[in-house]
């Protein structure tokens, strides 16, 4: 069993968030978000609801289709400042239909680890009934 105080490796964490009910999030996702140096999100107003609910005080930066290139460039120009970068969407798993592909491509080019943090699956919930 791993220690509760286990350090996270430096990298980009793709963190799934609840689709509707704020309680539909994994303990691991909450832990990653609390340990993040910076959280990139689509809409800070929506994300603040989730982060406030779980007392997550990490720096929050708006990251959407209109500023994706600019923010990705800024993040990588200051990458030495960040160990844990998390990417979240307003609901569900980032990058599926949300921004993030540019950031992921940059991480791959710079050999920066990318870690997916899965969420609660509505597909398996539906299949169970």
Predicted segments, located by residue:
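Short glycine-/acidic-enriched loop or helix-start segments at secondary-structure transitions
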Residues: 24-25, 50-51, 72, 96-99, ...
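Short beta->alpha linker loops
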Residues: 42-45, 66-67, 91, 118-121
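Short, glycine/charged-enriched secondary-structure capping and boundary segments
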Residues: 28-31, 53-56, 75-77, 99-104, ...
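Glycine-rich, highly charged phosphate/nucleotide-binding loops
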Residues: 67-76
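Glycine-rich, flexible N-terminal cofactor/catalytic loop recognition
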Residues: 1-66
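Short glycine-cluster motifs
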Residues: 80-129
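Generic short alpha-helical segment signal, independent of protein family or function
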Residues: 56, 68, 80-84
């Amino acid at each position: 069993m791993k220690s509760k105080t286990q350090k996270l490796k430096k990298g980009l964490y793709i963190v799934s968030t609840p689709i509707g009910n704020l309680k539909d999030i994994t303990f691991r996702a909450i832990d990653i978000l609390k340990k993040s140096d910076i959280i990139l999100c689509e809409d800070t107003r929506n994300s603040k609801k989730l982060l406030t609910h779980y007392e997550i005080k990490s720096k929050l930066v708006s990251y959407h289709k209109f500023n994706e290139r600019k923010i990705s460039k800024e993040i990588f120009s200051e990458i030495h400042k960040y160990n844990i970068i998390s990417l979240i969407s307003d609901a569900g798993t980032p990058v599926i239909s949300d921004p993030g592909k540019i950031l992921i491509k940059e991480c791959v080019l710079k050999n920066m680890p990318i870690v997916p943090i899965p969420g609660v699956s509505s597909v398996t919930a539906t299949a169970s009934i």
